[in-house]
Curated annotation (Swiss-Prot):
ATP binds at K240. NCBIfam families: gltX_bact. This is Glutamate--tRNA ligase 2. It is found in: Cytoplasm. The keyword Lipid metabolism does not apply. A motif ('KMSKS' region) lies at residues 237-241. SUPFAM superfamilies: An anticodon-binding domain of class I aminoacyl-tRNA synthetases (SSF48163), Nucleotidylyl transferase (SSF52374). GO terms for cellular component: cytosol. It comes from Campylobacter curvus (strain 525.92).
Length: 459
């Protein structure tokens, strides 16, 4: 069975690059009838954050990336790691190193002075003497001393590393007994049955060490896919200076999970010229072998465009549910569905939609200064006052359009003579959906009241 995993460290909030990695793993597993596992790599007890762990789970729930089985926590598996360290020691594949920090620092200085790559010199690899007093040893793996390590990567193809350039007898357990990152990753991936590892290419340099450990422990190597990083539009690695990076911040900014996942799947992968991908489409077409080798570029305008698409196309009930979190209960409004459907056509985010809705639902507490100065004049106020007099019944948008056109014709006016001033009176702004839909939503009594308010404001 194909098994993938996502394995974040809870030392910070989930980054959108991490969510893309999770999505790729999720899609590959689900499309092939496999399992998608979640592992929290929380062995750094000083830097771990319970808030960060919860944020990861919240992001998964928001995006509906359901994982199989229970979450695996590395901090609860130290005894398992100790067993495998002991196994390597017993088999002579690892050894205790008593080199002090001072000795390591001195060795590094000497190597740098000779312009050599700093690395451990294997002095305790075959040590049989009496250990020095007062030093708790670290445990090092016996790595190959020469040759090449070949990685057959599903994205990058064959990647070769010269042992002399990349490896030394690296540490697998610290002097306090805690295991190192590469060791825990290998043990857990093997015991969890992970067959395919899709991760960022910042992990590529770890892979030779992990391959050494897979082989030493007698575990089958998984297939690796190393995904190029996401860059900002300036070509530099994506960071906070390019905008939001925390996944849940996108929710707070009014982005839909469908839009964010669609956006992320396309950062490095494509299917023809298609831009819109539902989860069902992704499951049908996604293959990690098709991921681009080169870095992708974050494009905020593309995300806005996708979000606007999903706002326009989501079913009313679902969009109304989403909008409740932004303080607007469209179902509780007499003309809620009409208002939502009118606003969705011009909204890029749910925050924007919420602001537009509140501007219509609530009578203006203030008026946009520029719009007021431009459109609220003695003549426009006179027109508004006359228009209010014809409002006797609640009509639909077509009905309001009919009586408005009759009013304009009878008074020798054009729509522009009324519409913008009416928008300002009703919403406080010169920007709104169709003025006739706004009239239907508000009803004649509320329209007249808001016109009266602006007439009083001007006196």
């Amino acid at each position: 069975m194909l098994v993938t995993r996502f394995a974040p460290s809870p030392t910070g909030y989930l980054h959108i690059g991490g969510l893309r990695t999770a999505l790729y793993n999720y899609l590959y597993a689900r499309a092939n009838g496999g399992k998608f596992l979640l592992r929290i790599e929380d062995t750094d007890l000083k830097r771990n954050s319970e808030e960060a762990t919860q944020a990861i789970k919240e992001a998964f729930a928001w995006c509906k990336l359901d994982h199989d089985g229970e979450v695996t926590y590395q901090s609860r598996r130290f005894e398992i790691y100790k067993e495998y360290v002991a196994k390597l020691l017993a088999e002579g594949k690892a050894y205790k190193c008593y080199m002090s920090k001072e000795e390591l620092d001195e060795l590094r200085k000497e190597q740098e002075a000779r312009k050599e790559r700093p690395k451990y010199d294997n002095r305790y690899r075959d040590f049989t003497g009496t250990p020095p007093a007062g030093i708790e040893p670290v445990i090092r793996i016996k790595a190959p001393l020469s040759g090449e390590i070949l990685i057959r990567d599903g994205i990058k193809g064959e990647v070769k590393f010269k042992v002399e350039d990349i490896l030394d007898d690296f540490i697998i357990a610290r002097s306090d007994g805690t295991p190192t990152y590469n060791f825990t990753v290998v043990v857990d991936d093997a015991l969890m049955g992970v067959t395919h590892v899709i991760r960022g290419d910042d992990h590529l340099s770890n892979t030779p060490k992990q391959i050494v450990l897979y082989d030493a422990l007698g575990f089958k190597r998984p297939e690796f896919f190393h995904v190029a990083m996401i860059n900002g539009e300036d070509g530099k690695k994506l960071s906070k200076r390019h905008g939001a990076t925390d996944v849940m911040e996108y929710k707070r900014m009014g982005y839909l999970p469908e839009a964010l996942l669609n956006f992320l799947v396309r950062l490095g992968w494509s299917h023809g010229d298609d831009e819109i991908f539902s989860i069902e489409d992704m499951l049908k077409y996604f293959d990690p072998h098709d991921i681009n080798k080169s870095s992708s570029t974050y494009n905020a305008q593309k995300l806005d465009w996708l979000n606007a698409h999903y706002i326009k196309t989501l079913p009313y009930e679902r969009l109304a549910d989403e909008m409740k979190e932004f303080g607007v209960d469209f179902r509780a409004l007499p003309k809620g569905e009409l208002l939502l459907n009118s606003l969705r056509e011009r909204s890029k985010t749910l925050v924007e939609m919420s602001q537009s809705a509140k501007a219509i639902i609530d009578a203006p507490a203030a008026y946009d200064e520029k719009a007021y100065a431009k459109f609220i004049t003695p003549s426009s106020l006179e027109i508004l006052a006359k228009f209010a007099e014809i409002l006797t019944l609640n009509l639909d948008a077509a009905g309001y359009e009919k009586i408005t056109n009759e009013f304009l014709e009878q008074n020798g006016l054009k729509l522009k003579d009324l519409a913008q001033a009416l928008r300002v009176a009703l919403t406080g702004s010169s920007v709104s959906p169709s003025i006739f839909e706004v009239l239907e939503v508000l009803g004649s009594k509320e329209i007249k009241q808001r016109i009266q308010n602006i007439l009083k404001e001007r006196k």
